[in-house]
């Protein structure tokens, strides 16, 4: 779920503020998404959106509401003991996105952009 995802980002990027920083970034970070990603970070969000879309094809899986178990160790997120396919899948979506975010530069000019750029 989004609370776990936010915590995973804080694990890979200590001191970050995931909700304000990433909820309205580029064309894909935040709700929805379209067009061409504006940079590497936005591409991370596009891939994460697709991963959640793939998770929704698992019967009964609702990624935004799915609770899972994970652990943060040395800026790495580790998915732990998630007994259902949905939980394991969603945890991995969030884990991979958090790692991607940690590698991608944050460009303030791509925060709260005019969405006409995303067509």
From Swiss-Prot:
Active-site residues annotated for this sequence: 48, 94
Glycosylation sites: 82
GO cellular component, one term: extracellular region
GO biological process: arachidonate secretion; fatty acid biosynthetic process; lipid catabolic process; phospholipid metabolic process; positive regulation of fibroblast proliferation
CDD domains, sorted: PLA2c
UniProt cofactor(s): Ca(2+)
Transmembrane domains' residue ranges: none
Pfam annotation, one family: Phospholip_A2_1
Cofactor: record remark: Binds 1 Ca(2+) ion per subunit.
Disulphide linkage map: 11-72, 27-118, 29-45, 44-100, 51-93, 61-86, 79-91
EC nos: 3.1.1.4
Tissue expression: Expressed by the venom gland.
Catalyzed reactions per annotation: a 1,2-diacyl-sn-glycero-3-phosphocholine + H2O = a 1-acyl-sn-glycero-3-phosphocholine + a fatty acid + H(+)
Similarity remark: Belongs to the phospholipase A2 family. Group I subfamily. D49 sub-subfamily.
Name of the protein described by the UniProt record: Basic phospholipase A2
Organism: Micrurus mipartitus (Red-tailed coral snake)
């Amino acid at each position: 779920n989004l609370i776990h995802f936010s915590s995973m980002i804080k694990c890979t990027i200590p001191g970050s503020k995931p909700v304000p920083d990433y909820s309205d970034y580029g064309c894909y970070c935040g709700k929805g998404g379209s067009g061409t990603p504006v940079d590497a970070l936005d591409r991370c969000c596009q891939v994460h959106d697709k991963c959640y879309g793939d998770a929704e094809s698992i019967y009964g899986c609702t990624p935004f509401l799915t609770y899972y178990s994970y652990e943060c160790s040395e800026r790495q997120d580790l998915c732990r003991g998630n007994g259902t396919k949905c939980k394991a899948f969603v945890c991995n979506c969030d884990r991979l996105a958090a790692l991607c975010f940690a590698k991608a530069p944050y460009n303030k000019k791509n925060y709260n952009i005019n969405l006409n750029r995303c067509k």
